[in-house]
């Protein structure tokens, strides 16, 4: 599986150290193990997890600006955990309302010795942090409208929202609240995934 991951990373032109590659593989191993008991993801095959979870998460790395991020509705830590492994100098808060997902994330952090991740069990609209975030990341979480409504208190003044989507979300974009602007919409090519992927980057109007 290591050679498969290295090949995928080369195709995507993503550079990770040998230690980071081992951590990504260990994450897949833990996800596979926990998934059998706790049903954390519908993806059952570890090789599919490499493409649909690890590579799909890492594909957004190049678009992130800043050092402090929150991954809302993170599920089993996606995309937050793969990103935190790849960016050890950045800080990631991973938020989800389900306890089993948060327990899994904490176990991963313990076993992989990730010190830049904080796992929080809460509903996003109820969550308050002492410091605001450079980026609010969501993957398969909610419509753009709902994400902005529930998360409007989280980004810093110049912070951004990063919404990971499948198909180009035309209908959602047309309903965007006036106080927000689209900074860019990028089509993401993920090696091993044929399906359409997009990232929508949004900021508040000044």
Curated annotation (Swiss-Prot):
Gene3D superfamilies: Vaccinia Virus protein VP39. It is found in: Cytoplasm. It catalyses: guanosine(527) in 16S rRNA + S-adenosyl-L-methionine = N(7)-methylguanosine(527) in 16S rRNA + S-adenosyl-L-homocysteine. Its EC number is 2.1.1.170. S-adenosyl-L-methionine binds at residues 73, 78, 124-125, 139. GO terms for cellular component: cytosol. CDD domains: AdoMet_MTases. It comes from the Bacteria. Its main location: cytoplasm. Keywords: Cytoplasm, Methyltransferase, rRNA processing, S-adenosyl-L-methionine, Transferase. GO terms for molecular function: rRNA (guanine-N7-)-methyltransferase activity. Disulfide bonds: none annotated. Belongs to the methyltransferase superfamily. RNA methyltransferase RsmG family. HAMAP family: 16SrRNA_methyltr_G. Specifically methylates the N7 position of guanine in position 527 of 16S rRNA. This is Ribosomal RNA small subunit methyltransferase G. It comes from Idiomarina loihiensis (strain ATCC BAA-735 / DSM 15497 / L2-TR).
């Amino acid at each position: 599986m290591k050679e498969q991951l290295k090949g995928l990373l080369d195709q995507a032109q993503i550079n990770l150290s040998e230690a980071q590659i081992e951590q990504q593989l260990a994450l897949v191993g833990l996800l596979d193990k926990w998934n059998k008991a706790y049903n954390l993801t519908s993806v059952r095959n570890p090789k599919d997890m490499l493409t649909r979870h690890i590579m799909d998460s890492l594909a957004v790395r190049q678009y992130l600006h800043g050092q402090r991020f929150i991954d809302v509705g993170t599920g089993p830590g996606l995309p937050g955990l793969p990103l935190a492994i790849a960016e050890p100098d950045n800080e990631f808060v991973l938020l989800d309302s389900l306890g089993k997902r948060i327990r899994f994330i904490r176990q991963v952090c313990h076993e992989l010795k990730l010190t830049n991740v904080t796992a929080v069990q809460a509903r996003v609209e109820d969550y308050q942090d002492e410091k605001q975030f450079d980026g609010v990341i969501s993957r398969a979480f909610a419509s753009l409208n709902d994400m902005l409504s529930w998360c409007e208190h989280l980004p810093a003044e110049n912070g951004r929202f990063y919404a990971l989507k499948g198909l180009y979300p035309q209908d959602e974009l047309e309903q965007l609240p006036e106080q927000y602007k689209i900074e860019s919409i990028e089509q993401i090519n993920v090696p091993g995934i044929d399906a359409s992927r997009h990232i929508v980057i949004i900021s508040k109007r000044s």
